[in-house]
From Swiss-Prot:
Binding positions (GTP): 11-18, 58-62, 120-123
Chain positions covered by the region annotation G1: 11-18
Keywords, sorted A to Z: Cell membrane, Cytoplasm, GTP-binding, Membrane, Nucleotide-binding, Ribosome biogenesis
GO cellular component: cytosol; plasma membrane
Region G3, annotated ranges: 58-61
Gene giving rise to this polypeptide: era
One of the record's GO molecular function terms: GTP binding
Designated name of the protein: GTPase Era
Job of this protein: An essential GTPase that binds both GDP and GTP, with rapid nucleotide exchange. Plays a role in 16S rRNA processing and 30S ribosomal subunit biogenesis and possibly also in cell cycle regulation and energy metabolism.
Domain of life assignment: Bacteria
Region (G2): 37-41
Self-association state and partner proteins as the record states: Monomer.
């Protein structure tokens, strides 16, 4: 039996969504920069084995929009919820819950789909601080699961993938391969530009 499904990764800017996706896929498919909102596209990372396929949809970092483009990007991120079976809501272990997190939580409650809370950057905090973070977020919403990880180091990422695959429904293989190499190269070039230039780069 082959299992498949779509999974969205939501979270505030720079919480490690792209780092997680890149670790899972083993290649750089989402640009990483210290500028917020640098992941423009619903970049799909496709995790495929002989028995399952997870199609990851990475969203623009959700923020309080200050421009029409920013507003479009936020709504684009939320529109993803209509296309997936499960949401990974990613938050950083080393930052307290903020207004941006609360805004996302309210949207997720309204969406009424399974949400897994992924607490990233656990390598940066003491276990006691991690437990406080888990309790705080659990007090706000009933999550299907809570999974602490370090996307950068890969800690507990395999367990998260297993959790996702265990909950997939029977289905077919949506995609035979990942994004075209041309797309990957163009995104890597744009990342270099963002890192090297001190001027305003459209992003």
């Amino acid at each position: 039996m082959f299992k498949s499904g779509f999974v969205a990764i939501l979270g505030r800017p720079n919480v490690g969504k792209s780092t997680f996706l890149n670790h899972v896929m083993g290649q750089k498919i989402a640009i990483m920069s210290d500028k917020a909102q640098t992941t423009r596209n619903k970049i799909m990372g496709i995790y495929t084995t002989e028995t399952e396929q997870i199609v990851f949809i990475d969203t623009p970092g959700i923020h309080k929009p200050k421009t029409a483009l920013g507003d479009f990007m936020v709504e684009s991120a939320y529109s993803t919820l209509r296309e997936v079976e499960t949401v990974l809501f990613m938050v950083p272990a080393d930052e307290k819950r903020g207004k941006g997190d609360d805004m996302i939580i309210e949207r997720l409650k309204a969406a009424k789909i399974p949400v897994i809370l992924v607490i990233n950057k656990i390598d940066k905090v003491h276990p006691d601080q991690l437990l406080e973070q888990i309790d705080d977020f659990r007090s706000q919403m009933d999550f299907k699961e809570v999974v602490p990880i370090s996307a950068l180091e890969g800690n507990n990422v395999p367990n998260l993938i297993k959790l996702l695959t265990d909950n997939l429904e029977e289905g077919f293989q949506y995609f035979p391969e990942d994004h075209p190499e041309r797309f990957l190269v163009s995104e890597m070039v744009r990342e270099k530009v963002l890192h090297l230039t001190q001027q305003e780069v459209p992003h």
